[in-house]
Design a protein with these regions (language model features):
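ABC-family P-loop ATPase nucleotide-binding domains
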Residues: 286
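Alpha/propeptide regions of enzymes that mature by internal proteolysis
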Residues: 1-215, 219-267, 271, 275, ...
């Protein structure tokens, strides 16, 4: 299964990092736990809560130290708020992240949050009882951060199988090598009618100057973009959004031509050479929500930005999402978490520099979404529900053909 760049149809104004992953931001690691359990042939006697499960958890870990003691600056942005995340409000208020970022299926959220609390207490036993040993007389709590999308089309939501042992396993598996596709929190997700999942990408801002107004260089035209800093921006997505006919790749309306096997079985014209008679409709069974069911976007950077600056970057993620086709449906929970690994933070006031960071966010989010689709394999879930892998060769043919036309 190729990533989008391996197909030879995607290019960008800014270069990717060496892994083209969120872990190109130094110190950032990602861990997955993937649960595929139970037969998909559940039959009419199926009882919710008993499986099968096509779900998991993904952890994004900003650094390898004690995150509760050495918090990182963070920000939250809501594109559309139809979701059930945990811990977002305190990050909005204080601009700090003190646990790994966990992504999972919707009804797993409370159990995953509880697991993060347990792990935080194990490493910080003063949580909840004060800092008597250090002479500080107050009490402390912990704010576990958990994002979610609904994987209920393929997985049994009521079973809620992801808890402490699964989160421990994801933490133990954390690495700078980021697996993509139907893994971790992306095991049971759907994207534009195809199999979605986890995707990642990064961008590097060329140059070596400090982040100060006196050292900014003028910008060249797009395509020869240069910017100060040499900073990295990375994105990781959990994709579970969009209608089949909306899918757009490299500016080409792929969803107007490429039909899912489910659509073909329901009587629509087969093949990718003929446009849908009505691009605004689809016979594809949409799963739990006719609009798709959300995307979680995690952004990381090593640039010394404060929470306000990170919030400005997080807001730009919506443009990368829009490049892939979705207008942002009312029933979709679309959230962005951004953090910086730098020790100090500053707000971006200089417009040329903000433009460079914004482009890095837009491109990395767009490419991460493509990778989540192309790296995912076909998954059969509960009651025979199936999400098929997006056919990479057909996508490449359509993009090249559209450009030739």
């Amino acid at each position: 299964m190729p990533r989008i760049r391996e197909l030879g149809i995607y290019d960008s104004a800014l270069p990717p990092g060496p892994r083209n992953a969120i872990s190109d931001v130094a110190g950032v690691t990602v861990g997955h736990f993937t649960l595929i359990a139970g037969t998909s042939d559940t039959g009419p006697a199926w009882r919710p809560g008993s499986g099968p499960f096509r779900t998991g958890v993904t952890l994004v870990i900003p650094h390898g130290g004690n995150l509760y003691q050495d918090k990182v600056v963070a920000a939250i942005h809501t594109i559309n708020g139809f979701g059930k995340p945990h811990g977002f409000e305190q990050v909005r208020e204080l601009g700090l992240l003190e646990t790994p970022i966990a992504l999972t299926g919707t009804l797993n959220v409370p159990r995953v949050a509880d697991a993060l609390i347990t792990l935080a207490i194990e490493h910080n036993p003063h949580i909840g009882v004060g800092f008597a040993s250090s002479g500080w007389g107050g009490y402390s709590s912990v704010n576990p951060l958990v994002g979610e999308t609904s994987d209920g089309y393929l997985s049994d939501l009521q079973g809620r199988p992801i808890g402490l042992s699964e989160v421990r396993a994801a933490l133990a598996a954390a690495s700078a090598e980021v697996a993509e596709g139907a893994v971790g929190a992306g095991t049971g997700t759907s994207c534009y009618g195809w199999k979605g999942g986890i995707g990642t990408a990064s961008r590097v801002l060329p140059g070596g100057e400090e982040l100060t107004p006196r050292r900014l260089r003028p910008f060249a035209p797009l395509g020869k973009l240069s910017a100060p800093g040499g900073y990295t921006v990375g994105a990781l997505v959990q994709t579970n959004m969009g209608r089949a006919e909306e899918l757009t790749i490299c500016g080409v309306p792929i969803g107007r031509y490429l039909r899912t096997p489910e659509e073909d079985s329901r009587g629509q014209v087969t093949g990718a050479s003929e446009e849908r008679s009505d691009p605004g409709t689809s016979n594809l069974e949409p799963g739990p929500s006719p609009q798709g069911s959300s995307i979680m976007i995690v952004l990381a950077t090593d640039a010394p930005l404060d929470s306000r600056g990170l919030g400005r970057l997080a807001a730009r993620a919506a443009f990368g999402l829009a490049r892939t086709g979705t207008p942002g449906h009312g029933g979709s929970g679309d959230f962005v978490i951004a953090f910086s690994t730098a020790a100090t933070g500053a707000t971006i006031h200089e417009q040329p520099l903000m433009d460079a960071f914004a482009l890095a966010v837009v491109e990395s989010v767009e490419e991460a979404i493509y990778n989540s689709l192309l790296m995912a394999h076909t998954v059969v879930g509960r009651q025979g529900h199936t999400r098929h892998a997006l056919p990479a060769d057909e996508v490449a043919r359509l993009v090249r053909g559209h450009r030739t036309f």
